[in-house]
Amino acid sequence: QQGVDVLVINPVQTTSAQTIVDTVSPSGTPIVFINREPEESVLDSYKGKCCYVGADARQSGTYQGELILETETQGDINGDGKVTYIMCKGDPENIDAQYRTEYSIKALTDAGKAVECLYEYLDNWDQTTAQQDVANALAQYGEKIEVVFCNNDAMALGALQSIQQAGRTAVSYTHLTL
């Protein structure tokens, strides 16, 4: 009879991570969470037997903001002293989406930039949904939109399609500064 040496788990919702730990911990089986980072308290509750392996979404978000700062206008295309943006967000319960959203803007504000969010869209990692939402945003806000932030590449591709269809030019495809 074979047992389990370790569980490798890619949680759909990180809010379920504590339940997973509580269920598995009596057996003493180690747990490795991948792709979606559970709260630190979850990892601490099964110390030495539980870890996360994956990208640091805080760093990913910070990098997005830093890329904006590297452009000629630093995201302030109209020169009014404020970066206006829309945000295409992934799953609201996904900590990676939360961190990417927070830290992309934090990079701008930490650099002294004033920011204004025109709208946040819940696109759940979906290219088609992001494409529709960005098309709607461009119709509603037009030239006010200077930056489009997306929590993942699929949504960014959808956003880019709408930007191009609206006759706008993306200054950089890495972060969709318009």
What are these regions (language model features)?
Residues 3-11, 30-34, 87, 142-152, ...:
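Periplasmic-binding protein-like
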Residues 174-178:
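Conserved small/polar residues in nucleotide/adenosyl-binding loops
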Residues 6, 11, 50-52, 83-93:
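Short beta-strand segments enriched in small/hydrophobic residues
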Residues 60-67, 95-114, 129, 133, ...:
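Short, solvent-exposed amphipathic alpha-helices that sit
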Residues 1-4, 131-143:
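Short, well-structured alpha-helical segments in soluble
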Residues 111-124:
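Short beta-strand elements in bilobed, periplasmic/extracellular small-molecule ligand-binding domains
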Residues 52-82, 130-131:
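Hydrophobic alpha-helical segments within soluble ligand-binding/sensing domains
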Residues 20-59, 80-84:
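Flexible loop/hinge segments that line or gate small-molecule binding clefts
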